[in-house]
Swiss-Prot record:
Taxonomic lineage of the native organism: Eukaryota, Metazoa, Chordata, Craniata, Vertebrata
Alphabetical UniProt keywords: Coiled coil, Intermediate filament, Keratin
Source organism, top-level taxon: Eukaryota
UniProt cross-references to InterPro entries, sorted A to Z: IF_conserved (IPR018039), IF_rod_dom (IPR039008), Keratin_I (IPR002957)
Protein species of origin: Mus musculus (Mouse)
Region: Coil 2, residue numbers: 255-398
Family (UniProt): Belongs to the intermediate filament family.
Pfam families (UniProt xref): Filament
Protein name, as recorded: Keratin, type I cytoskeletal 39
Site (Stutter): 340
Domain spans labelled IF rod: 91-402
Region called Coil 1B, residue ranges: 138-238
SUPFAM superfamilies, alphabetized: Intermediate filament protein, coiled coil region
Its biological purpose: May play a role in late hair differentiation.
Length: 482
């Protein structure tokens, strides 16, 4: 008789190891589940009541959960040979199923080991490829940079030497220009003085010509007066002639030549005195003018010297200002080049950091994924080991419980049972009430169908990506006891 789609509770008479008490599990079974999915081993999902569980000292391994979907018992013949043969057949089937699952598990373990080896090779290859990017060789660039820096320093020294030579040449040219301007100004002053003296000489020449003209006019007037006087005397003498003979006692006659000579001498002395006065006045005026010219020339020379000094100072300051401007421009160029270089270097370092962060994030995600897969596989491995240990213990317990002379017992299965979970292999036995009859030579064996439902869920970032369910049937044949 088979009972399907029911909730079954199995009560165990054998206490579990390292547990404080029985643990009840409640689950629903359905008869339309498939028996297997490509031989994959997964865990199972059960609900545990509150307040019950294992003790403070848990076992090393956690056994899988078992769900008895359907059970039935088949009456055997009365002879013990048929019962033993049926038990051995079911044990062989169970061991064959376990061997198949173990082979699938080992094959999957080998496949995962190969995948892990491939992943390790890929990681090592990626690390070896990433090494040149992380640690580039800059030695050749350093030598080139040092050579270029030496050339730049030599060029800067040559430029500074040329700039100093240019500055010295400019200063010498400024000095020569200042001297030329001073000499030119002196020449202009001398030319102005010469022009003034020429004007004075022209004025004196004109005054001399005027005086000579006056002397000549006076001489001519004197001659005219003399001739007129002689003519008058002659005319008077002619008129008087012999008629009048007058004897006059008078002073001796005056010598006109002497008088003229005296007048000439007097006028010459007057002219000489006038000339001397004019020469003295001219000399005094010339001396005053010369003194003024000398003083003005001295002042002009002092002013020119001051102007030259100021011009030299201005030129020196302009040269220094230009040098400071050039230095500032060179420093600004160096600053811009340094900023550009360090900006590019910073951008490269930031890109390298971003790449490394991306690689680290990828490696972390890969490690997390592999750790999750490893945990899942380790859980599967532990579950499989627990299943194998459980099957072995069940087989050993069944072999130890088989009686030599089994008794025939008529019993009816109950729909209430109790399941137990612990960290050690689970021992289950059916203590089902029934109507006992007198013991016979052999009891009817019971065949129980146990279905192991295992569910594997792949979780990433707290979300279920995929879920797999595996159902493994297992038959357990028992003989009833008296």
């Amino acid at each position: 008789m088979d009972t399907k789609g029911s909730t079954v509770t199995i009560s165990s008479s054998t206490p579990p190891q390292n547990c404080s008490g029985n643990t009840n599990f409640r689950t629903n079974s359905s008869s339309n589940k498939s028996c297997c999915h490509d031989g994959q081993s997964t865990g199972c999902a059960l609900q545990t009541p509150q307040g019950q569980g294992c003790g403070s000292s848990p076992c090393l391994y956690r056994c899988p959960h078992y769900l008895i979907r359907t059970y039935s018992f088949h009456p055997c013949l009365d002879d013990g040979s048929r019962c033993t043969e049926g038990i051995n057949t079911h044990e062989k089937e169970t061991m064959q199923i376990l061997n198949e699952r173990l082979a699938n598990y080992l094959e999957k373990v080998r496949m995962l080991e190969g995948e892990n080896a491939d992943l390790e090779d890929k990681i090592q290859e990626a690390c070896s490829k990433a090494l040149p990017i992380l640690c580039p060789d800059y030695l050749s660039y350093y030598t080139t940079i040092e050579e270029l820096q030496q050339k730049i320093l030599c060029t800067k020294a040559e430029n500074s030497r040329l700039v100093s030579q240019i500055d010295n040449t400019k200063l010498a040219a400024d000095d020569l220009r200042a001297n030329y301007e001073a000499e030119l100004s002196l020449r202009q002053l001398v030319e102005a003085d010469a022009n003034g003296l020429k004007q004075i000489l022209d004025a004196l020449t004109l005054s001399k010509a005027d005086l000579e003209a006056r002397v000549q006019s006076l001489t001519e007037e004197l001659l005219c007066l003399k001739t007129n006087h002689e003519e008058e005397v002659n005319s008077l003498q002619c008129q008087l002639g012999d008629r009048i003979n007058i004897e006059v006692t008078a002073a001796p006659s005056v010598d006109l030549n002497q008088i003229l000579q005296e007048m000439r001498c007097r006028y010459e002395s007057i002219m000489e005195t006038n000339r001397k006065d004019v020469e003295e006045w001219f000399n005094t005026q010339m001396e005053e003018l010369n003194q003024q010219v000398v003083s003005s020339s001295q002042q002009q020379q002092c002013c020119q010297k001051d102007i030259i000094e100021l011009r030299r100072t201005i030129s020196a300051l302009e040269i220094e200002l230009q040098a400071q401007h050039r230095m500032r421009e060179s420093q600004e160029c160096i600053l811009t080049e340094t900023e550009a270089r360090y900006t590019a270097l910073l951008a490269q370092i930031q890109s390298l950091i971003h790449n490394l962060e991306a690689q680290v994030a990828d490696i972390r995600s890969a490690l997390q994924r592999q750790s999750q897969e490893y945990e899942v596989l380790l859980d599967i491995k532990s579950r499989l080991e627990c299943e194998i240990a459980t099957y072995r213990s069940l087989l050993e317990s069944l072999d130890g419980r088989l009686p030599c002379n089994p008794c025939a017992t008529k019993w009816e299965p109950s729909c209430q049972a109790r399941a137990m979970e612990c960290f050690t292999p689970v021992y289950t036995s059916s203590s089902l009430p029934g109507i006992h009859k007198p013991c016979r030579a052999s009891g009817p064996p019971s065949r129980i169908l146990v279905k192991i439902c295992t569910i594997t869920k792949e979780i990433k970032d707290g979300k279920v990506i995929s879920s797999y369910e595996h159902v493994q049937p297992c038959y357990i044949t028992r003989a009833t006891k008296v």
